[in-house]
Amino acid sequence: MQAVIAIPELAGLVSEQQATDLVMRPVAGVPLLIRTVLTAARAGASDVLLVVPAPMSARPLQKLLGTIPRQEVRVELIQISEFDPQGHSSWIILKRHLKDEFLWLPWNWITTGEFVSQLPLVGIGSVDWSKAAYATVHEVDRESASSALPPRSAGGVAVTSPESAVAAERFLVARSGKVLDGIHTSFNRRLCRPFVTMLSHTSVTPNAVTVGGVLVSILSAIAFTNGTYWWSVLGALLFYVAGLFDEMDGMLARVTFAESPQGTWFEGFADGLSYLLLFGGITIGLHRHYGRLATVMGIALLVGAILALIATSLQRRRATNPDQPNEYLGRFYQLLEKDSGNWISRVVRQVQAFQRRGVMIHYIVLFTAIGALPLVFFLATVGAHLTWIVILYFNRRFFSQSSGVIPTVTKVKEAL
């Protein structure tokens, strides 16, 4: 898919240096023009046609665009005097570079790849050139156009001033969640928004935020080891904060285009480690009250948690492409929905959400506050062992044809 991005004539309004500064204005830590190009790539564009005014020096733009990895998107820069998207003559000049269908993105239009990828196809004569559009040079059948997705709200923010840049950042952070977010996770993300906005203006990486969450999980485990009510409540609250770190690292990665397969695997490993720390701390704390029984139960829980972590990692490798491990949960939900005729799939689809960390942290706090920590301990033990058993079942049911090879020690190490 092709995307067209045009920078208007700015020479008569501002100096060349000021024009360059405008297109390089950082929005949530990413230069404005780079953000527009990467948004097009995230929407599915593999080629970007960048139209710039003839008087504008192309050298700083080429240097800026050179920071984009070639595997992300290919950018072709064309200089045209007085390009006007509303003028038919401008498109005639671009005709030999233009494909029949293309994404139109104003250079200063901040939006999301998800929104752009869902735009309906419209004729070039019906485009609102101040916003993103999916256009074609051919006529569009009115019935098919009317049956397309209805236009939603503005779907973006035009950055024309420092104030609008702040509004654009709020827009991006508010939409940095996932389609599968439920009530619990959406609440968590609302709490995280100001911190994500702040972090986007620093050199802090998503992986650094992940490490911060692990450190808070260590403090949580230490608090649980004391075994008293108030120390346990403190441990639960710290574990909730650690869960917010888990939300923030993904939000920051999506806002700053810092997503990577390695980051997804690292986040998954950190989540598993945080659970092991939590269960270890609770085991030591309950041992002070229940003695050997708590220790035996804790060992069973830790074994189940480790097996569940390994099984989940192996299933993620089977269910997704190597460069898209972040699509694991969505892919797994799709398979469960297709297999809804199977009662096991129906039950797992309903209860699986409670295993997600963004949901779990709420119930850890709740059950700890009402003094039901032993019940959580028991349910977690049963749930951990059911998790790896169910994963093995679904591996055989969904993925046995795609990979009939029994996982080796090397594959287990790679998955972890």
Question: Across the structure, where does each feature detected by a protein language model lie?
Answer:
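N-terminal glycine-rich phosphate-binding loop and ensuing alpha1 helix
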Residues: M1-S57
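Conserved beta-loop-beta/alpha segment of the NTase-like Rossmann-fold superfamily
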Residues: Q62-Y134
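Juxtamembrane helix-boundary/capping and inter-helix hinge elements in multi-pass membrane proteins
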Residues: I80-Q86, V255-Q262, H289
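A feature for the membrane-embedded catalytic helix bundles of lipid/isoprenoid biosynthetic enzymes
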Residues: W129-V196, F269-L416
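Conserved small-residue-rich
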Residues: G177-A223
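Short amphipathic alpha-helical coupling elements at transmembrane boundaries
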Residues: R193-H201, G250, R254-F257, T264, ...
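Membrane-embedded alpha-helical segments that form the functional core of polytopic membrane enzymes
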Residues: P206-Q262
